[in-house]
Amino acid sequence: MPHMLYTEIPTQRPVTPLLDAIDHPQQLRQLEHSQLLQVADELRQYILYAAGQSGGHFGANLGVVELTVALHYCFNTPNDRLVWDVGHQAYPHKILTGRREQITTIRAKNGLAAFPAREESVFDTFGVGHSSTAISAGLGMSLARRYQKDPCEVVCIVGDGAMTAGMAFEAMNDAVAHDADLIVVLNDNDMSISCSTGGFAKHLAAIWEKGHLVNVNEHGEAYIQPHPKWTYNSRLHQSATDAADNLFKAIGFDYFGPFDGHDVTQLVQVFNALKKRKGPRLVHVYTKKGKGFAPAEADPITYHAIGKINAASGGKTPPKYSDVFGEWLCDEAAQDERLLAITPAMCEGSGMVKFAKQFPQRFFDVAIAEQHAVTLAAGMACEGLKPVVAIYSTFLQRGYDQLIHDVALQNLDVTFGIDRAGLVGEDGPTHAGAYDYAYMRTVPNMVIMAPKDENECRQMLHTAYAYNGPAAVRYPRGAGVGVEIQKEMTVLELGKAEIVAEIKANSDEQITVLAFGSRVMVALEAAEQFAQKHDVSVCIVNMRFVKPLDEQMIRDLAEHTHLFVTVEEHAIMGGAGSAVNEFMAQEQIVKPIINLGLPDSFLHQATHNQMLQDCGLDAKGILNSIERAWLKVNQVV
């Protein structure tokens, strides 16, 4: 039965009789081998339908349909552990493990998580979202079960993009040291989110160029069995040796493949045979991202994720902050040949496609290697260049030691464009940029800015670039507020806030709102409503800088302020409001103050607006918080 190739996303639920009978992998394992092709086809159709209903990650899931069917068919899940790296590709896994009818709720409020989550299912053995963690986690599980004298098979499914991170090789090295019973499935689709880059990608390409896909059907499972005389003697293993000098063998893994990752019959043979072996084993499978859906096969980057097919679209949308960054980057580079740009595998998401085409010799995609990205920039700065690192807030966490030790300690001239700061909606807690103020503002020499709109974002990026030292601009996901962007770039005064509005009332009482970044314009709306309702003067400040704070403005405003309110789209603990509290305490400025921001909890996915409402950071929530605080200040119960 050939693979079906679809050209449209179905709007009606497809007919899937075999899939509908599977609520547990045990029911899958009761089917005949010959029925697995139909299961895979039904699963692919259902993913197309479900993704169209809910949106979400797309191409990666279509690419692992046969692999997922084979894994759950061969291994005794959940007792045997499947550990998915990143989790973009976990939709087929969720569907086969009792969540078929819930899959259309994925990434929605109170729906299924975007990635595997331990609290959601016993089949989700490890919570993921960030890259390159699966082998470490899987090794930990394998060693724990060995220690408990209750061994099981542990299978880590890792993409070729994730294998570019050092953590993956640290884990493989340790697995060999412990002679752990561990299977790593290398899902090689020549992609991460963007195209894979670097020496490892070239190494995999060499295997393909010099070798060939191994066909177990031609020789049978005997070619995966250990030879009685020596460990690595099998024609199957030898095929990899002939294909290229093999990095995995050099580390100490027993290597098998490469296999066709869409041949479910062959994959079943391979996995059943591998269960009879012990020690660290790596199975190399080749898959196609977007498999079975023609548009996604042709353009896997665009179809990495999709929106709902029936999502309403309105008029003209303001530019995304990532696009504002990309335009600034090109403009700044045109004026200064010292500018080099670095991204850890997020060229498209960070808005750098235009720069990469316009300045290819000055563009460095270092793959999924955030630690390396930061120290690479430090080395460039040591030679008198001015590197710009474009990175998501949640991923900069992985380069924190390098930020401190390699950049800030040496006061090197590195600019950080920190994207996806704050809440990120449907991607949930693994991707939230909720902690960057806290982990950066404690670092000496750092300058931290947050723009209120897209024009200020451009000016802040220029300011950070002009600053002689480490400086960061953090901006949110999605579109700006719709203001005109000035082509001319201006260096802002370091550590200087601006008063956005002063709303005067008849009384002498005043509230001062110190707002940061994305919450400035929303806080202005709430403050205007409060002033109208309560006849109280309100001063709204765009703080601009988290570090250095505009301390003088706070001192001056304190003389007339009866209540301070700080507002930020960041964790309250350790955030910008905490910085204001610390300053006021040291200066002995004794004024009532409330801090509005993200609570001390991991926030589950919903739309961005829903999450803001739940946190009280929309205009209504901010207004309610100010009113409650004002009642306390005036001792009105």
Curated annotation (Swiss-Prot):
Pfam families xref list: DXP_synthase_N, Transket_pyr, Transketolase_C
Protein's recorded name: 1-deoxy-D-xylulose-5-phosphate synthase
Family according to the record: Belongs to the transketolase family. DXPS subfamily.
Native source species: Acinetobacter baumannii (strain AYE)
NCBIfam families from the UniProt entry: dxs, PRK05444.2-2
EC number: 2.2.1.7
Biological function: Catalyzes the acyloin condensation reaction between C atoms 2 and 3 of pyruvate and glyceraldehyde 3-phosphate to yield 1-deoxy-D-xylulose-5-phosphate (DXP).
UniProt xrefs under CDD domains: TPP_DXS (cd02007), TPP_PYR_DXS_TK_like (cd07033)
InterPro entries: Dxylulose-5-P_synthase, THDP-binding, Transketo_C/PFOR_II, Transketolase-like_Pyr-bd, Transketolase_BS, Transketolase_C
Gene: dxs
GO biological process, alphabetically ordered: 1-deoxy-D-xylulose 5-phosphate biosynthetic process; isopentenyl diphosphate biosynthetic process, methylerythritol 4-phosphate pathway; terpenoid biosynthetic process; thiamine biosynthetic process
Keywords: Isoprene biosynthesis, Magnesium, Metal-binding, Thiamine biosynthesis, Thiamine pyrophosphate, Transferase
Amino-acid positions noted as binding Mg(2+) in the UniProt annotation, renumbered to this chain: 160, 189
A Gene Ontology cellular-component term: cytosol
Leading EC class: transferase
Cofactor remark: Binds 1 Mg(2+) ion per subunit.
